[in-house]
Structures are given as C-alpha cells and as structure tokens.
C-alpha cells in the first residue's frame, strides 16, 4: 500500500468519527463539531495542485477517492505530475491526521486578512503534530458549529 492509499484509508477511518471540541476564550465557549467525508481527501492531500493530470484535475472528487482506495489511482500515477513534489509531504503527514486530532493541539481564530501571503479561507487554525511532524490544519464552517477540514500541510 502506498502513501496516497494510506491517506485515503485514514480519511475512511475518520468518516466514522465526529469530533466535538469546546474552545474557551474570555469566558465565552465555542463549540466545534468536526466531521469528515470522502471529498476531504482531495484538498487535504493537495490533489487540486496536480493540474497536469487530467483525471485528477477534472474528475469527480468522490470517484477519485474510490479509485485511490481501490488502487486504480496510485502514488506512482500521481508522481507523474510535475507538481507532485509540492504535495508529497502533505500526503505522508495526512496518514497521521487522526493521531494529530487525538493528541495535543492549539486552536487559533484565523483571520485571512492578516495573512497576506495566504489565500486560505478558514475560521480556525489548528497547530499540532502528525507522526512527530509539526502540521497546520485549517477548519472552515459549514454551519453554526459544524466544521470541515479546509486545508492541511506540514509546517
């Protein structure tokens, strides 16, 4: 099993989990409910960056996810992209996302206007470790207290 298939299996495991996180600041509590779907793999692994692979660029996310799980799309196939080197570390760290979420992490309210270098639209930045590698996880809001993972990458 290669890294991308391991990452897809990690997301598959997380689909069965819901994280309920309560944050407190200045006497105010904020509730975050974090859930996962197969669509999360595409962006978290950075597959959207592989614009030179037609099947990845224009394919339906759920179909790509299933193809990775079944072994039809492999790491060797993705490595044909000239941009694979940009996402390789993300894929390797993504395998340990559940460990990161179950471990110690810091949550920060995220204001994209203060990060001119970033185009990430998110509500929270989570800093933690995945397999002893420092990583950032960005959370976006689906509704009042339901969130999804918007982006993920090693520091």
Residue ranges, per PLM feature:
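Compact beta-sheet-dominated globular domain cores
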Residues: 127-155
